[in-house]
Amino acid sequence: MAKTNISPGMQQYLDIKKDYPDAFLLFRMGDFYELFYEDAVKAAQLLEIGLTSRNKNAENPIPMAGVPHHSAQQYIDVLIELGYKVAVAEQMEDPKQAVGVVKREVVQVITPGTVVDSAKPDSANNFLVAVDFDGCRYGLAYMDVSTGEFCVTDLADFTSVRSEIQNLKAKEVLLGFDLSEEEQTILVKQMNLLLSYEETVYEDKSLIDGQLTTVELTAAGKLLQYVHKTQMRELSHLQALVHYEIKDYLQMSYATKSSLDLVENARTNKKHGSLYWLLDETKTAMGMRLLRSWIDRPLVSKEAILERQEIIQVFLNAFIERTDLSNSLKGVYDIERLSSRVSFGKANPKDLLQLGHTLAQVPYIKAILESFDSPCVDKLVNDIDSLPELEYLIRTAIDPDAPATISEGSIIRNGFDERLDHYRKVMREGTGWIADIEAKERQESGINNLKIDYNKKDGYYFHVTNSNLSLVPEHFFRKATLKNSERYGTAELAKIEGQMLEAREESSSLEYDIFMCIRAQVETYINRLQKLAKTLATVDVLQSLAVVAETNHYIRPQFNDNHVITIQEGRHAVVEKVMGVQEYIPNSISFDQQTSIQLITGPNMSGKSTYMRQLALTVIMAQMGSFVAADHVDLPLFDAIFTRIGAADDLISGQSTFMVEMMEANQAIKRASDNSLILFDELGRGTATYDGMALAQAIIEYIHDRVGAKTIFATHYHELTDLSTKLTSLVNVHVATLEKDGDVTFLHKIAEGPADKSYGIHVAKIAGLPKSLLKRADEVLTRLETQSRSTEIISVPSQVESSNAVRQGQLSLFGDEEKAHEIRQALEAIDVMNMTPLQAMTTLYELKKLL
């Protein structure tokens, strides 16, 4: 960019921009935020705003674009949503009083991970994640700047780091080390994350006390440093650092959560049709966030699960009190976000009114909880801090009709401050005084249309038309001359005006100071407000789960220590809700101590995947503490769920369905324990038939012999059902069908034993394929089944049988000497000693095709 003959103002812009090269710089100039040079060109395209130039007649005009300061937030939101950073430079002094260039400074850098204000507020968390690496393990810290939530853990490998970032749905990742090229590709290209870097650890360790590893400390410290550097203020709302271990929760990868539609429907990317949608009867934004967290991280502690169950049971048993509780929670605003706005110095009168309204509801909520008269609920009661003194301050100080801005006045209630009341009285009575002066002068002067007007330039004045100029009294003095009239003042009017203007200015200044003082007082309560927010959120989620349990007739699950799964008449909770109770066909699921694998066969569209997902959702809901969709449930506590359900290529990373399958299978067999749950649907379908079958069998055997996890393996390879004869912990089940007069009905019920056929052509018929095509497919199927039966009787003869056949002049098996010679040559070329089992299977398959 050409920067010759730069003005002092533009030099100031360039000096500031130099410190923020990776951000759009919004440069406050009067009522606009201006952008220049490359920022202006790019922003004009992204924001669809006009592009002009600052010095149009210069040899090298400076590109310029701007947005009004009062609507800047909506433009900032667009840039942040697109993954950019925005640095906001404000005027630090009154331009009218400035000597030379107005002093400007960047007051905040807004990034995708540090959004606090938004024109489109979202109740969901917005986590900023920091990752550090010590050469052995990874430290991962995350924070929601808008709520103050702050957590840290350590992880063994980059795969775990990736999964945790995905689970947190982060948009920005802060790194304290250099990534490999492959890792960079994963985070930037595959996960579409903004990467930021920080080398410095925050000096103040008060927020990160605790028994942490070195890499956890550096990850948390660098995260704190970055947040303070971008927000440029003390963040009193940040909560004490919480250390957590992945193993403390039911572990699930992002792919598993996606395939089970836990927080959003995988097909629509919407909340509707997800478990989150089903369970969400929360009344507060805080409750919504906490519910999502519970779904993301079910518990593995039986004691903690039973504690949640007990409270839900108490709520279920008291319909009237629970209804009152739900209604009271509707009056609770987002305390966490309001606290952060106070901490950031951005809380306006409406924010404080919302906080006050919430605090006014708390005593009612506490009284309702006390009425349940239950020891488990009493723990929640004891955690509720009503903060009556803060509620009183807001109620008596802030006018209930106060505007959303602090510059318009009318914020503070009458009676709160004597000086403010005096100034308001002067302004109120001054209006009456002016009316009295107007009436008196009209009568004394004889000017019947004499009136007093006001504008900013001339203040209060008498308006006299030219036709009445001869009647103007001597004590009037001229203030302005117009074409058809003149404006006059009097000493009395000037005195009243002075008193009113002084009162207005003093009132405005005093009211602002009072509000800032009140906001500072509110800030001292932030820690107590955050604790209250957590308790109210917990109450909200528990009442939500109680409402859902009652509405859908869910039951309280039991847990055992002997690895037994018993689900009687279980339902897929989400599918049932979408279809309706009358339409849904329940299924029982049973694994005794000896059974670790169910091999399920059956037609497409018959309900195999739903059966598998039903088990997963039942486990997740149970370990959340929720009641579940069944007549009776008794489960072991699982430590992890691994799934491969549904075929999909990973187009961004260029991985095929088969590769994705193998990678997910690898994660399962490497990480699963005998306390895990594995759900594999049609594994191996992305490759050749015999390859797929060989891999499927090998994986089943590996899980059976080495892992021992409870597993449901759905397959179309009917040959695999024979594994039940040699794998003692494997049982066959199938989806029952009813075949009559050529028509097939899928019963959607699981029965013991293997399926007899797949009914693929019948599914094609349902899909509406042409009759001629279906007829041809039936012919081909009959032929293939005949060939299959004929080849099944061919077995490898023993060495004795072979020699006897030669002596007796046995006829050629192939009936074709030329083909026999071809096969003999192929056999002789095989290096048996150096073949892998998979190569041997493939070669055998190729030889079979020669028959």
UniProtKB/Swiss-Prot annotation:
UniProt xrefs under NCBIfam families: mutS1, PRK05399.1
Gene3D superfamilies the record matches: 1.10.1420.10, DNA repair protein MutS, domain I, MutS, connector domain, P-loop containing nucleotide triphosphate hydrolases
Cellular component aspect of the GO annotation: cytosol
GO molecular function: ATP binding; ATP-dependent DNA damage sensor activity; damaged DNA binding; mismatched DNA binding
Family assignment from sequence similarity: Belongs to the DNA mismatch repair MutS family.
Function: This protein is involved in the repair of mismatches in DNA. It is possible that it carries out the mismatch recognition step. This protein has a weak ATPase activity.
GO biological process, one term: mismatch repair
Residue numbers binding ATP: 602-609
Keyword annotations of the record: ATP-binding, DNA damage, DNA repair, DNA-binding, Nucleotide-binding
UniProt protein name: DNA mismatch repair protein MutS
Pfam families per the UniProt record, alphabetical: MutS_I, MutS_II, MutS_III, MutS_IV, MutS_V
